[in-house]
């Protein structure tokens, strides 16, 4: 009897060790993805054999020249477009269309002008028919997270560009997605506001632990925000280089002047120019 119990305990211990040693599955995975569009001359390949993985709580940026297919890739991940071949998986489940497991923040302001800040944040929650009390609690929480509690009843026309994007981020996060997708969210902002928003986003990411995939033309922005940077080739877009940033998780804007930051920037720029 004692021997049997020992064997059971040993088996449980071995199973626990195997579970600890098992590789962590990716939160988001893109497998062999390609995308082509029909043209008068036949077809045009925009993306070719894209493969990437994001793990839980990672912040990853994609950089590449205009027209390389970055936005097309993000739209496919969001479920707003279909790939010609390959697949996208979130938590191991195939993406077949838009879903609450992915939040999206666009470059251009996408707030509903007839809704207040609170109502904009609540929009997705109402579509999901979330109970009113839970909606109120979540709205209040994310208003506080993005520092806009005092603007809850304001309309988009009363907000600055940076504040509008904070609301857009809060609206996306309120649905508590597995992955937050960002398509050049600060591209329309002036340089000073852009840097302020970069610091804000980094602090927000540290607070919420959300997994982020962001595309940007700004190499410094990509390095400052992310743990890894993917460099895409010109059309057809392929993954040219993956750079591990290797900077401390807690960062400030002065870090952009550090030798470590400059070295990563050199690698990324060299790859973009090749």
Language model features with spans:
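Short coil-to-helix segment of the ABC ATPase nucleotide-binding domain corresponding to the Q-loop/switch region
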Residues: 115-123
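Helix-to-loop junction immediately C-terminal to a conserved catalytic motif
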Residues: 78
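Conserved signature/switch motifs of ABC ATPase nucleotide-binding domains
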Residues: 154-157, 175
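Conserved ABC ATPase "signature" region
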Residues: 122, 126, 133-150, 203
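Catalytic Walker B motif of ABC-type/P-loop ATPase nucleotide-binding domains
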Residues: 180-183
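Conserved ABC transporter NBD signature motif
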Residues: 86-98
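The feature captures the beta-strand-to-loop junction immediately N-terminal to the Walker
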Residues: 63-65
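Hydrophobic anchor residue at the start of the ABC signature
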Residues: 169
């Amino acid at each position: 009897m004692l021997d049997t119990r020992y064997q059971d305990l040993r088996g449980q211990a071995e199973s626990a060790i195997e579970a600890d040693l098992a590789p962590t599955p990716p939160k988001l995975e893109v497998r062999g993805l390609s995308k082509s569009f029909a043209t008068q001359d036949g077809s045009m390949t925009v993306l070719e054999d894209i493969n990437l993985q994001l793990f839980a709580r990672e912040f990853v940026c994609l950089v590449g020249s205009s027209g390389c297919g970055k936005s097309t890739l993000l739209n496919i991940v969001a479920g707003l477009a279909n790939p010609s071949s390959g697949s996208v998986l979130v938590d191991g489940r195939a993406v077949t269309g838009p879903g609450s497991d992915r939040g999206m923040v666009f470059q251009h302001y996408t707030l509903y002008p007839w809704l207040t800040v609170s109502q904009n944040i609540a929009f997705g929650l109402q579509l999901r028919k979330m109970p009113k009390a839970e909606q109120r609690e979540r709205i209040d929480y994310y208003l506080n997270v993005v520092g806009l509690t005092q603007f809850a009843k304001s309309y988009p026309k009363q907000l600055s560009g940076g504040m509008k994007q904070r609301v857009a981020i809060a609206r996306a996060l309120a649905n508590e997605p597995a992955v937050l997708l960002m398509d050049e969210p600060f591209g329309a902002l002036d340089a000073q506001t852009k840097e302020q928003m970069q610091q804000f986003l980094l602090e927000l990411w540290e607070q919420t632990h959300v997994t982020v995939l962001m595309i940007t033309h700004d190499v410094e922005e990509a390095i400052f925000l992310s743990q890894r940077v993917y460099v895409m080739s010109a059309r057809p877009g392929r993954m040219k280089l993956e750079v591990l940033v290797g900077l401390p998780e807690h960062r400030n804007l002065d870090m952009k002047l550090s030798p470590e930051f400059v070295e990563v920037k050199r690698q990324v720029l060299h790859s973009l120019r090749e």
